[in-house]
Amino acid sequence: MKKFTKILLIGCLLVMVSCNNWLDVDPKSQVKDKDLFASEMGFKEALSGVYSLMTKEGLYGKELTFGWLGVLGQEWTSVPYNYEDDQKYDFENAASEVRIDSVWTGLYNAIANANKLLKELEGKENLFSGDNYSIIKGEVLALRAYLHFDLLRIFGASCAVGMERIAIPYVTEYAPTIFPQEKVGDFVGKVLKDLQDAAKCLENDPILTGRTVSEIDDNGYLMNRQVHLNYYAVKGLMARVYLYKGDYANAEVCAKEVIGSGCFEWVKQENLTNESVADLTFSTEHLFALNIVTLGNIVDKYLDGGNNSFALEESRLSEYYGSSYDYRYLYLFKTGVGMSNTLRYLKKYDQLESVSWAQSYRNKLPLICLPEMYYILAECRYHSSGDVLEPLNEVCRHRGVADLSEADLSAFETLLLAEYRKEVIGGGQLFFQYKRLNRSVVPGTDVDLAGEGRYVILMPKEELENLGWVSNQ
């Protein structure tokens, strides 16, 4: 039995956030889940398990944020030695193959978990109180879409290259079935269908309705919606997907809905200046963030100056930001010590020790944020001859830098990518922007990614042995 089928069989809710013996797994890895899915609490735990899978270092806990995708986006000038080939877009080596296999398997495993949950939800509305059934279902559909979309952005051609290109499977069932590969356009259509269904399920999400939720309401289950794929996170993700597709009209509609909601506030400089209690991830701007309880340990291993750390030369950092008044330049990097004193290390994810440090700042790794909505709006307006400067300058004004001018728009794509780089460094999104626009070169390398076909990562070789599958490149 091939690996892909095995993922579908054993990807059954393998982790849990707060319970060590959450599952009873027999030697054949079959989950005894009758009790788990007999109560609303069991479904809540299962959903937490899907989010927890995403926090692993092989996925968003490192590789799909500041790690592997950060390297592919040329975000760092100094990388651990086992990423040096990836930095050159050479994936024909053992370290890269292990990393790619981990990403592929991890994302499809999380999707299998989501599909299992959706299957178990069928016909069990009577188990749930209030709006929890539809909200949980909406989150799971959104998770399935989110995970698939990132698989496509890694292992599929961009929409700009060809909607008819063969990509990868879109898995919608929990079953030992090998799903067929989809064309890029069809795959994106399925992502959007899941997101549209998710948004409908989330119409009673408190973040949308404005309903106040406290600890006495179902133990506060619907509090802290920004660490769940909430209604506005779904709309933000839809804006991202529509933009990737080149559907600027719908991307603009979704981005404007998020911006107009008033639910997300720009970080205030006063919350950045005190290093012991700073809001380093700009938490008020999060549409969706993961809560990673081991984030401090991850930072210590990879972003704190050791041999396995990712870092930037000060000269490159200054080149990126241009202004020493930029909040991101001022507050989000720390200087290396000793022989590393020319290097700058990202401190966005640092876990501060002060007891006064706000709980809402802790353990947060953002995946969708407010500034992206303004960049999407600007790009959509660029294609419709609208006011491009206003949304770009809205971000500038909340980052402590001067407004851009009409003269800056002479090379719009280059400008936009430079603004993205300032904002999303360490977040795993920059590589995808260059791929989406099919730019030949990512600054920091002379490899012709578009011309040499390096933007599409080859799926694990073992998967190509599956009957009927062809190369995704």
Show which residues each predicted segment covers.
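Hydrophobic-face positions in mid-chain alpha helices that act as interaction patches
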Residues: 227-229, 246, 250-367, 423, ...
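Short, surface-exposed recognition loops and adjoining beta-strand edges that mediate ligand/DNA contacts
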Residues: 34, 63-78, 157-164, 168, ...
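Membrane-proximal, proline-rich intrinsically disordered regions
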Residues: 19-70, 255, 442-473
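Conserved, well-structured interaction surfaces
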Residues: 44, 83-155, 177-185, 195, ...
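Bacterial Sec-dependent N-terminal signal peptides
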Residues: 1-29
